[in-house]
Amino acid sequence: MIKYLLSVILFTPAVLFSQIDTETVYYGKDYFIIEGTIIPVSEKESPYDRLPASYKDIVREPVWDLSKSSAGLAIRFVTDSPYIKVKWEVLNNFSMNHMPDTGIKGVDLYYKNNNEWQYINTGRPKGFKNQYTLIENMSNEFKEFKIFLPLYDGVKNIEIGIGSSSSIEKAKNNDKQPIVFYGTSITQGGCASRPGMAHTNIISRKLDLDVVNFGFSGNGRMEQPIAELISNVDAKLYIIECLPNMISP
């Protein structure tokens, strides 16, 4: 009898967690806005690219490949869910010996607390396809959240998981003029421990502005196609930090 009761006690939580998990509903790009980009989704190969598809045959191959990394991009949404989960799939599953995987291909959750962005948690990657519970046990009023995307890998897909009885909707667009960065690996986010700690993302949070990141590791070389692209933006400020990459081809 004692052995039977112990089994019930041990396995009941597992059953409860399983039931909770099956009630999670995941929502994709139609339920959040994508920040950190000046290019309409219709002009990209993927919503999480940093250059338009038309640039594939215009820029050098390394620049195009690096533009597939989602550095500086974030998704923003409002939900009344008591918990937030995330599923995301990366393009390359990169790893480097000088930068944590959480910075390369992880995701960061922030909460807008009295008009200031407060760090909540980091989704730790394990491979191409990842799933992580970012926060639990919240109250049920609507709150605004932002998730910063990987710095040195691309995103094929990302979905937000919330309770089946909860709602999710797009946050309001930030109508302020953006800040545009063009530069090197430093701009792209190397070697931040997690996406939210790239300096462009820190500036975005502190000023509550959309910041566009055209950092291309080893390839920020003041090239004409990128100059033409950013010159079409009515930006509050342009920050060009290409000097470390200004070498002969």
Question: What positions do the PLM features span?
Answer:
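A beta-strand-loop signature enriched in Asp, Gly, Thr, and Trp
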Residues: 238-249
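A conditional alpha-helix N-cap/helix-loop micro-motif detector
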Residues: 68, 219-222, 249
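N-terminal secretory targeting modules
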Residues: 16-178
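Proline-aspartate-enriched helix->loop->beta-strand connector
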Residues: 230-240
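Serine-esterase "nucleophile elbow" of acetyl-processing enzymes
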Residues: 100, 137-139, 145-220, 224-232
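A generic structural signal for short coil/turn motifs at secondary-structure boundaries
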Residues: 95-97, 188-191, 247-248
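Short, histidine-centered active-site or binding-site loop motifs used for metal coordination
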Residues: 90, 183-186, 242-244
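Bacterial Sec-dependent N-terminal signal peptides
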Residues: 1-21
